[in-house]
Amino acid sequence: MGLSEAEWQLVLHVWAKVEADLSGHGQEILIRLFKGHPETLEKFDKFKHLKSEAEMKASEDLKKHGHTVLTALGGILKKKGHHEAELKPLAQSHATKHKIPIKYLEFISDAIIHVLHSKHPSDFGADAQGAMTKALELFRKDIAAKYKELGFHG
């Protein structure tokens, strides 16, 4: 399930575009997640009150959280699958404190793919989409294993 070096390069090439505006990309990804899967909003006490897309777009807290999410994900992607040190605290907090089911990580992965394709179509063609999908699947598989170690079966 690992990625080739060429696939990692495709992932990191588009990720450089994301890093130019982590907050904007993150906010857009979270909005897509919450609109497509409203049940995910219930896991975020400070966002539960945001009912419309306009409210979400106006939320500085949502923008900040999007930045945080993508900063963490970028750190993981840059490790090219050697992300044990980065994954452990993330799995710990998401399993024990936030109780985020793996299914929700699938939902946000889909949102990431969609937003990257819509914002960067020339840099995110079929090969890059396939590589990013594999990278996100690897992340989810590894975090699911950590969840299991922690006794969380979300």
Swiss-Prot record:
Top-level EC class as recorded in UniProt: oxidoreductase
Top-level taxon: Eukaryota
GO biological process terms held by the UniProt record: removal of superoxide radicals
Phosphoserine, modified sites: S4
Sequence positions that bind O2: H65
Binding sites annotated in the UniProt record for heme b: H94
Domain Globin: 2-148
UniProt keyword annotations, A-Z: Cytoplasm, Heme, Iron, Metal-binding, Muscle protein, Oxidoreductase, Oxygen transport, Phosphoprotein, Transport
GO molecular-function terms, A-Z: heme binding; metal ion binding; nitrite reductase activity; oxygen binding; oxygen carrier activity; peroxidase activity
Localization annotation: Cytoplasm, Sarcoplasm
Catalysed reaction equations from the record: Fe(III)-heme b-[protein] + nitric oxide + H2O = Fe(II)-heme b-[protein] + nitrite + 2 H(+); H2O2 + AH2 = A + 2 H2O
Cellular component aspect of the GO annotation: extracellular exosome; sarcoplasm
Residues binding nitrite, per UniProt: H65
InterPro entries according to UniProt: Globin, Globin-like_sf, Myoglobin
Oligomer status and interactors: Monomeric.
Task performed by this protein: Monomeric heme protein which primary function is to store oxygen and facilitate its diffusion within muscle tissues. Reversibly binds oxygen through a pentacoordinated heme iron and enables its timely and efficient release as needed during periods of heightened demand. Depending on the oxidative conditions of tissues and cells, and in addition to its ability to bind oxygen, it also has a nitrite reductase activity whereby it regulates the production of bioactive nitric oxide.
Family: Belongs to the globin family.
Protein name: Myoglobin
Species assigned in the record: Mesoplodon carlhubbsi (Hubb's beaked whale)
Upper taxonomic lineage: Eukaryota, Metazoa, Chordata, Craniata, Vertebrata
